[in-house]
Amino acid sequence: MGIRIQELRKQFEDFTALAGIDLDIRQGELLALLGPSGSGKTTLLRIIAGLEHADAGRVLFGDEDATTMSVQARRVGFVFQHYALFKHMSVYENVAFGLRVRRGKARWPESQISARVFELLSLVQLDGLEQRYPMQLSGGQRQRVALARALAIEPRVLLLDEPFGALDAQVRRDLRRWLREIHDRTGLTTVFVTHDQEEALELADRVAILNQGGIEQVASPDEVYNRPSSPFVYSFVGAVNRLPGCVGADGLEVAGIVLSCPPQLSGWGAVDLYVRPEDLVLDAQEGWSAIVLWSQRSGPRMRVRARLEHSAHEVEIELSSATDEYVEGQKLRLIPRHYGVFFSESGS
């Protein structure tokens, strides 16, 4: 089931959490809501869940208007960062809880509940742990129980609010791969909130970048990283060098050299060029002359910081570890192979 967000607005006193957001979430996709603290991503997730109400706008589940629906009527599975498990209940009882609190005809017989619980414990790879209590589990295992409980009610949509934020780095990486596998097996429309760029780019089908209550870009991880639509996206997703320049009769000039001007850039004026460290490459003949300030190996890569000779600007370069060593004072020549250009605030 797809979800449509139409002109959603939410104000908390003087703070604008959502400023008229429009977003289409496709059926069966895994969408990441990525942004800094205060960008509106968690507020948007809570409004989709029915835990928060918008001041204006609509939330549609398929063709059904869910804006005023209760949490129960929406049939949403929700997973929080801090598990929200019942400490006094076993793993089995936690997973069964949502099914047991149903009333009337909606209530399943105990045999069906039991079958569903064991099916989900197998899905989340917790077979044999049904009688343990949350305090007897690791953080990663607790989050798996939380997901099984969210899936038990057969939700139409699965929502996750920074589900791996409380876990250490290695466990987060393992659970990311596992969650992707679970999603592919269930086919549920899934939305998750994160401030971790690596997590969003690795896990999601598409990423929605939020900033100050608005959406900057919605695109595939590859497009968000390689073709950002705004300076904010360039700066927020991944490392980037920013260099001032100008567009005039001679084309795009940055730090003393003329570069190819992107066709979508219309007009003349002051601009900023954005180039990622891995997109600055060594060239024997063309480009900027630069002086190495320092270099450092980082795993399979080498990071080099250099100052452009004809300007006061410094850049970071990321090179393959197979390249030579670089020492302070060494001269290089650099050329950007891929970059983005945007008019600066003072530009036309």
UniProtKB/Swiss-Prot annotation:
Gene3D superfamilies: P-loop containing nucleotide triphosphate hydrolases. It is a peripheral membrane protein. Its EC number is 7.3.2.3. Pfam families: ABC_tran (PF00005). Residues 3-237 form the ABC transporter domain. Its main location: membrane. Belongs to the ABC transporter superfamily. Sulfate/tungstate importer (TC 3.A.1.6) family. This is Sulfate/thiosulfate import ATP-binding protein CysA. The gene is cysA.
